[in-house]
Amino acid sequence: MHPMLNIAVRAARKAGNLIAKNYETPDAVEASQKGSNDFVTNVDKAAEAVIIDTIRKSYPQHTIITEESGELEGTDQDVQWVIDPLDGTTNFIKRLPHFAVSIAVRIKGRTEVAVVYDPMRNELFTATRGQGAQLNGYRLRGSTARDLDGTILATGFPFKAKQYATTYINIVGKLFNECADFRRTGSAALDLAYVAAGRVDGFFEIGLRPWDFAAGELLVREAGGIVSDFTGGHNYMLTGNIVAGNPRVVKAMLANMRDELSDALKR
């Protein structure tokens, strides 16, 4: 096992255990709004602290980028840990048992290690660049769909970017005519992990942040899939507009989305 994967798994499990314990005691959860339709809890912050502490013990010099604390610069800028301590906070607050810890390690701009941990199902999705993706140690392969016929597509509403609501609904309408059904679960990290596992055939979302998809992107790639922006390029790290699936599914999704995109979403 890659030494950084070992630490990422340890950190994810520790944070996941903390989250699961707090899920059982909802009276101890304190939620607040940090932005439009964007929530944070004391559990997000406590889970983040556990992850940072675990990383710092082994790699004190590395840079850490987190959803709640921003960038914590280390002396080694080439190695960045990109963390979402609780992806699916709204689900957690509402006691919907679908959320995850997401940890990725980027070295010189390339994601090398990924962990997405679902503490409620005890499902640990892991990947190391060039060595495949696993779920609880078993090798993952994505969907073998050849087109959109019969596919299940996952997505997330652009609740932080409602200016795109009409465009988004138009894209959904276009894809709905081609696929079998949609799933909207509330955790982009798990959506991407499910693409890697073949549980859903494709995924798209507008305006994600790097910590939402950094780990999931590598899971998809290592399970034989591809990830692109809405025009088939690689600008999603900047825009957060992301499409994922096997190459044929992504190609078909992009073809259906193309005519519905506003200029802002073509970047």
Curated annotation (Swiss-Prot):
Catalysed transformations (reactions): a myo-inositol phosphate + H2O = myo-inositol + phosphate; 1D-myo-inositol 1-phosphate + H2O = myo-inositol + phosphate; 1D-myo-inositol 3-phosphate + H2O = myo-inositol + phosphate
Cofactor(s) essential for the protein: Mg(2+)
This protein's UniProt keywords: Chaperone, Cytoplasm, Hydrolase, Magnesium, Metal-binding, Ribosome biogenesis, RNA-binding, Transcription, Transcription antitermination, Transcription regulation
Record field: pH dependence: Optimum pH is 7.8.
Similarity field: Belongs to the inositol monophosphatase superfamily.
Ways its activity is controlled: Inhibited by Li(+). Li(+) binds to Asp-84, Asp-87 and Asp-212.
Binding-site list for substrate: 67, 86-89, 183, 212
Annotated InterPro entries: IMPase, Inositol_monoP_metal-BS, Inositol_monophosphatase-like, Inositol_monophosphatase_CS, Inositol_monophosphatase_SuhB
Effect of residue 183 to A: Some growth at 30 degrees Celsius, greater IMPase activity, partially inhibited by RNAP
Note: E.coli makes very low amounts of myo-inositol-containing phospholipids, so the catalytic necessity for this enzyme is low.
GO molecular function, one term: magnesium ion binding
GO biological-process terms attached to the record: inositol metabolic process; phosphatidylinositol phosphate biosynthetic process; ribosome biogenesis; signal transduction; transcription antitermination
Residues bound to Mg(2+): 67, 84, 86
Induction and repression of expression: Transcription is autoregulated. Repressed by the Nus factor complex (NusA, NusB, NusE (rpsJ), NusG and SuhB).
Name of protein: Nus factor SuhB
Enzyme class, broadest EC rank: hydrolase
Localisation per UniProt entry: Cytoplasm
Record-level GO cellular component terms: cytoplasm; cytosol
Consequence recorded when altering residue 139 to C: In suhB10; decreases polypeptide chain elongation rate, grows at 30 but not 25 degrees Celsius
Cofactor stoichiometry and binding remark: Partial activity is seen with Co(2+), Ni(2+), Mn(2+), Zn(2+) and Fe(2+); in the presence of Mg(2+) these cations inhibit.
Ranges in coiled-coil conformation: none
Database matches in NCBIfam families: PRK10757.1
Family matches, as PROSITE patterns: IMP_1, IMP_2
Function summary: Part of the processive rRNA transcription and antitermination complex (rrnTAC). The complex forms an RNA-chaperone ring around the RNA exit tunnel of RNA polymerase (RNAP). It supports rapid transcription and antitermination of rRNA operons, cotranscriptional rRNA folding, and annealing of distal rRNA regions to allow correct ribosome biogenesis. This subunit may play a central role in organizing the structure. Has D,L-inositol-1-monophosphatase and beta-glycerophosphatase activity, has less to no activity against a number of other substrates. 2.5-fold more active on 1D-inositol-1-monophosphate than L-inositol-1-monophosphate (1D-myo-inositol 3-phosphate). Specific activity increases significantly upon heating. Only beta-glycerophosphate and adenosine 2'-monophosphate are alternative substrates.
Species this chain originates from: Escherichia coli (strain K12)
Its EC number(s): 3.1.3.25
Knocked-out gene: effects: Conditionally lethal, cells are unable to grow at 30 degrees Celsius and less, grow poorly at 37 degrees Celsius, but do grow at 42 degrees Celsius.
